[in-house]
Amino acid sequence: MILEIVIIIAAVLAVGYIVNLCEDIVKRGNDREMSFRESMDLADLPVVTFYQGDKKFNFLLDTGSNYSHISKEVAKEIQGEIIETKAKVSGLGEGTTSGVCRTTLSYKGVNYDIDLSVTDHLTDAFASIKAETGVQVHGLIGNQFFQKHKYVLDFEKLVAYTKK
């Protein structure tokens, strides 16, 4: 009788351990998760670092922006196709775009095709962010990116993730 109870308890504990292990594997298995915990701890800004080759580009996750933006200076550094269009932009002051840079950036080995509006007035805004926080921001990632790649921002866990 006691042996049967011990076996049942051991079996229940083993099943619980396996379930927890599987949950951890599933959580870690989301290779499309983007953490902005480090930047929030450092500067209280949701910033994610993308790469293009060996170059690093820090992008502020901006849920208030429909589109993703870079400055003219950053457009010179990023490899991509510039599509010449002009459009009025509202938000961080008034400005116009001098085109769209269609490029590919990577995060943790995953490539993302992204259209970045080249926005005239962002240089001063990025300089101000750097002066106040010490973080060099190269661009803004807007809602179009989150929708295209099906990202959800979780500000409790400080991650952007895709639902599988």
Where are the regions a protein language model picked out?
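Pepsin/retropepsin-fold aspartyl endopeptidases
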Residues: 1-164
